[in-house]
Every structure is written in structure tokens, then in C-alpha cells.
Regions:
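Sparse, context-dependent recognition of short Cys/His-centered cofactor- or disulfide-binding micro-motifs
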Residues: 36-40, 46-53, 67, 73, ...
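Hydrophobic alpha-helical transmembrane segments in integral membrane proteins
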Residues: 50-71, 92-95
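Non-catalytic terminal accessory segments
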Residues: 1-61
Length: 253
């Protein structure tokens, strides 16, 4: 119900509030000869862009191959394929939009990765958005597993509820990810071995510079017990944590 409410707010802004605001500003600022025409055109453009984004735009799916060269990568992992996806917000994928999630899962599986990683924001607001999508999410498989970390939305911070309810919902989100067969990393790491070589997949909880962002990431705890010679792939939802926390406090590659 909350997701439909949020979607309704966005549609109200795109189809009503923003066009009216554009028209009003044009009527107020522009010369009398042009203000009505430009206001109508501006409002129409906003409405068309909103309609496109809500229908065709949201259906766009792009795979971006990136080659990363590391001199200290263990030889056995040369050519190792990692698929990363993030910010799925599957609560938005209801009704006819469910096909988008299926297309995304199909695309991920078509990459034939050695490992799949998800870097947070599986839900919009609450874990009750997730059960109807577990069948699709459970299709994600890779030889070395599927790993995930939590994003700010996964902590239920945007839900209007007391702290105990939010904590319970966060635990439920974690449980759903595990039911999908994902290995959720909460300030912890796993070791992937190939012969005598190894690669560390570390997952740090969310840490962000914004005030409302959860600050649960702990670099020391995430890498506890590892030697500095270990090759580390660090998973984290918020990009700001890379320079602010991870680089100064670790040797993660």
C-alpha cells in the first residue's frame, strides 16, 4: 500500500504539480506576448517526459562491461567475471512492471558470471514488497555464489514506524535475501578459493555522508582476521564511503 502511495505522489508531481508550476512561472516572468504559449509548451513537455519515464523509459536495460586491471590479482582469477547490480527497488515492479525484473534477471544470467553481487536497495520502504518477487530473485545463480549488502532503503529508515518495528523489518529483509539464496554480508567477508589462490568478497553495511543515511559500516570488522596481502573486493551501497571510509582504513582493491 505504501508503495502505491509513493508512486501516486510521483505521478501527481509529474502530471499536475510540475506542469502547473512551469505554467505559472512562465505567466509571471515572461512577456505577455509569449508567456501563455511558452507556459503551455513547457507544461506539455513535462507531462510527456513524465509519461515516457513512467512507461518506456523505466523499461530501458543496459549492460555496461568494465575491464578492471589489478597487478596484484591472483593469477587463478585472471579473467574472473563479476556481475554487479544495485538499487533494484522491486517494490516498484508491480503489475505490468514485473516483466522488467524478469528481463533484468535474464540479462544477468546471460552474462555467465563467476559471481553475482548486489549492492543494496532491494526494496523501496518495507520488506512486504519482496515476497512476490522471491521466485525471480531466486533464479540468480553463479558458480561462486550470489552475495549482497544492504542499502539505506533496506533498513526501513523511510518507514513511518517506531525503532523496534524498523529493526524487525530490517531483519525480515535480511531473511528474504537469504531465502533467495543470496549470501548477505553484514560487515563480514567470505573467501573464494581457486587452487592455492584466493579472493576475498567483503561486504560492509551502509555508510553515507548524508544525515539520514544509516551509519552501520565498520571497515575493521568487515576485514577482521585478514592479511594485508589478501586481494579484497569490497561491496558497499553508498559510493561516498569509498573515499571517506574504505580507502583510508583498508587496502581493499
Amino acid at each position: 500500500m505504501m508503495v502505491q502511495y509513493v508512486n501516486g505522489i510521483f505521478l501527481l508531481i509529474g502530471f499536475v504539480i510540475a506542469p502547473l508550476l512551469c505554467y505559472g512561472v512562465c505567466r509571471w516572468l515572461l512577456p505577455r506576448r509569449w508567456r501563455c504559449k511558452i507556459g503551455v509548451v513547457g507544461a506539455a513537455v513535462i507531462i510527456l517526459l513524465t509519461a515516457y519515464g513512467w512507461t518506456f523509459g523505466s523499461q530501458q536495460l543496459t549492460v555496461r562491461p568494465v575491464t578492471i586491471v589489478c597487478s596484484d590479482l591472483p593469477q587463478s582469477f585472471d579473467g574472473y567475471r563479476i556481475v554487479q547490480f544495485s538499487d533494484a527497488h522491486v517494490g516498484t515492479m508491480t503489475g505490468w512492471r514485473k516483466a522488467m525484473l524478469q528481463r533484468a534477471v535474464d540479462s544477468i544470467m546471460n552474462q555467465r558470471a563467476d559471481i553475482i553481487v548486489f549492492t543494496g536497495d532491494l526494496q523501496n520502504i518495507e520488506p512486504h514488497e519482496l515476497p512476490e518477487h522471491l521466485a525471480q530473485l531466486s533464479r540468480l545463480k553463479a558458480p561462486d555464489g550470489v552475495y549482497s549488502v544492504l542499502g539505506n532503503h533496506d533498513y526501513a529508515v523511510y518507514q513511518k514506524a517506531d525503532s523496534a518495528t524498523k529493526a524487525a523489518n530490517c531483519r525480515l529483509t535480511c531473511e528474504y535475501e537469504r531465502r533467495a539464496g543470496w549470501q548477505l554480508l553484514l560487515n563480514e567477508h567470505r573467501t573464494i578459493r581457486r587452487g592455492s589462490d584466493s579472493l576475498i568478497v567483503a561486504g560492509m553495511e551502509n555508510w553515507g555522508v548524508a544525515k539520514r543515511m544509516p551509519h552501520r559500516g565498520d571497515v575493521g570488522k568487515t576485514l577482521a582476521g585478514l592479511q594485508r596481502s589478501a586481494f579484497v573486493v569490497m561491496l558497499e551501497h553508498d559510493p561516498s564511503a569509498w573515499r571517506a571510509r574504505i580507502l583510508p582504513q583498508s587496502w581493499a582493491q
